[in-house]
Swiss-Prot record:
Protein name: Chromosomal replication initiator protein DnaA
PANTHER family noted in UniProt: CHROMOSOMAL REPLICATION INITIATOR PROTEIN DNAA
Function recorded in the entry: Plays an essential role in the initiation and regulation of chromosomal replication. ATP-DnaA binds to the origin of replication (oriC) to initiate formation of the DNA replication initiation complex once per cell cycle. Binds the DnaA box (a 9 base pair repeat at the origin) and separates the double-stranded (ds)DNA. Forms a right-handed helical filament on oriC DNA; dsDNA binds to the exterior of the filament while single-stranded (ss)DNA is stabiized in the filament's interior.
Region (Domain III, AAA+ region): 148-370
Family: Belongs to the DnaA family.
Organism: Caulobacter vibrioides (strain NA1000 / CB15N) (Caulobacter crescentus)
Description of its domains: Domain I is involved in oligomerization and binding regulators, domain II is flexibile and of varying length in different bacteria, domain III forms the AAA+ region, while domain IV binds dsDNA.
Record's keyword annotation contains DNA-binding: yes
Segments forming a coiled coil: none
Binding locations of ATP: G192, G194, K195, T196
Length: 490
């Protein structure tokens, strides 16, 4: 009986251990299977960066850094994740999927909150070593001062160029705790121009240079949600104290609170208090303060009082530089040769001109599909993979549109582009228009030639090659092509 009792006791203990198995252990087992089934590229791009978080209630949430990653997982892997989780988790815990912003909004998380106020902590995931699955370590729990910051956004990974070199220099100066003559500082530019990268890099560098100083980084959306929660919980005094104790306060996307009166008032008082006490404040927005018509006039005035620094669209050389840096990062992360065919690189730089994020997203798509074969992908293969994305919401551009825009830009008549005139004042704009037609439409070379006064395809091919060669050395021509491309794409 004793032996039986001993066996029963051991079985019972094993059952209890299994039932109480930490979520991190369960997720590690799920990841081993997912990595084997999805492959290194897809797993590394979409699953590995996600973090498992466990709340005090026992609920488990897989948190992705972006909504795009969340959507990919939901579409491509979520059903399988659910099956694997159910198979390995004896307790039957429910696992949910959220983007970082969704999770933080739901939890009321705050970048500088004390440990007691944090609703959930990241769980470190270590995949067991096996013959078919190398060890993978997910990011460990961040200290409160670094929550909300993205480790990949540093000055080392930021590519400066004419479009952002002034903003880059200003951010570097702030991060070095140089004199705060301009305070506050506001960086502005449309979505995808590098503002968030710059602010993250600034925060990381400022903390590295002065570990004893208090740096607070948060998005305007988190500022709003945390303020609302503080009001509801009657904790506004603690909220104010946390912010106003900062040596450097960084708020991303401040335009988000435009029209939200009480939140604007709180930010206004925080700003004036910090500046008055010698603290430094940095904002980003999608437009300059003068264009924030829904913003409170007093707050808008204070945002304008320091240094307003715009980020311009990345030119072609900067886009190529960003692609090169991104390819090196992907190669280092996934263990393959960081290279890509020149014609593919040029295609990406020429087609994704509106946003650096769109440019990086296109490269991520190719990397996820090709993995180690990225360097071998042909231009036709790349165009086939990205074609659905290129069609999405893209304005249809006609050769007539191109001719009209080119003629207007160079101060000439559209008929001049179709004429037989060969003097440089006409020939160069005509060649530029042919190059644009090749880049922005799906028309064949013979068709383009017919629409330029009945010229043959060899004339068009010569024009395209001539412009391709010239724009690398002629900055004025390169600027003209950038301007026309943006105008045509709306």
């Amino acid at each position: 009986m004793t032996m039986k009792g001993g066996v029963a006791s051991q079985d019972f203990s094993a059952a209890i251990a299994t039932a109480c198995e930490p979520a991190a252990n369960v997720w590690s087992k799920v990841c081993v299977a997912l990595k084997r089934e999805l492959g290194d590229a897809a797993f590394g791009s979409w699953i590995a960066p996600a973090m498992l978080r466990e709340a005090a209630t026992g609920d488990v949430v897989l948190v992705t850094s972006t909504g795009i990653a969340r959507d990919w997982i939901r579409r491509s892997a979520w059903r399988r994740i659910g099956e694997l989780w159910a198979a390995h988790d004896a307790t039957g815990r429910r696992i949910d999927l959220k983007s970082r912003l969704e999770f933080e909004a739901a939890a009321g998380a705050y970048v500088e909150a004390t440990p007691k106020a944090v609703a959930a902590e990241p769980i470190e995931i270590v995949l067991p070593v096996s013959t078919d699955a190398p060890t993978v370590v997910a990011p460990s729990a961040k200290s409160p001062r670094t929550q909300g910051l993205q480790e990949r956004f540093t000055f080392e990974t930021f590519v400066p160029g004419p479009a952002n070199e002034f903003a880059h220099a200003v951010a570097r100066r702030i991060a070095n705790w140089a004199d705060g003559h301009f305070n506050p500082v506001l960086f502005h530019g449309p979505y995808g121009f590098g503002k968030t990268h710059l602010l993250n890099a600034l925060a990381w560098e400022a903390m590295r240079n002065a570990p004893e100083k208090r740096v607070v980084y948060l998005t305007a959306e988190r500022f709003l949600s945390t303020f609302v929660r503080a009001v509801m919980d009657r904790q506004t005094a603690a909220f104010k104290e946390e912010l106003r104790a900062a040596d450097l306060l960084i708020i991303d996307d401040v335009h988000f609170i435009a029209g939200k009166q009480s939140t604007q008032e709180e930010l206004f008082h925080t700003l004036t208090a910090l500046v008055g006490e010698g603290g430094r404040v940095v904002f980003s927005a999608d437009r300059p303060p003068s264009a924030m018509t829904e913003m409170d006039a007093h707050l808008r005035s204070h945002l304008s009082a320091g240094l307003v620094c715009g980020l311009e669209p990345a030119d072609r050389n900067l886009r190529l530089g960003i692609l090169e840096r991104k390819i090196q990062t992907l190669g280092a992360a996934h263990g393959f040769e960081p290279s890509i065919r020149p014609e593919v690189m040029q295609f990406l730089a020429d087609r994704f001109t509106d946003s650096v994020r769109e440019l990086e997203g296109a490269l991520n798509t190719l990397s996820a599909r090709a993995g180690e074969g990225l360097s071998r992908m042909t231009l036709d293969e790349v165009q086939a993979i990205l074609r659905p994305h290129l069609r999405s919401g893209e304005k249809r551009i006609t050769i007539d549109d191109i001719q009209k825009a080119t003629a207007e830009h160079y101060g000439m008549k559209q008929a001049d582009l179709l004429s037989e005139r060969r003097n440089r004042a006409v020939a160069r704009p005509r060649q530029a228009a042919m190059w644009l037609a090749k880049q922005l439409t799906t028309r064949s070379l013979p068709d383009i030639g017919r629409r330029f006064g009945g010229r043959d395809h060899t004339t068009v091919l010569h024009a395209v090659r001539r412009i391709e060669a010239l724009r690398a050395e002629d900055s004025a021509l390169s600027h003209d092509l950038e301007t026309l491309t943006r105008k045509l794409r709306g």
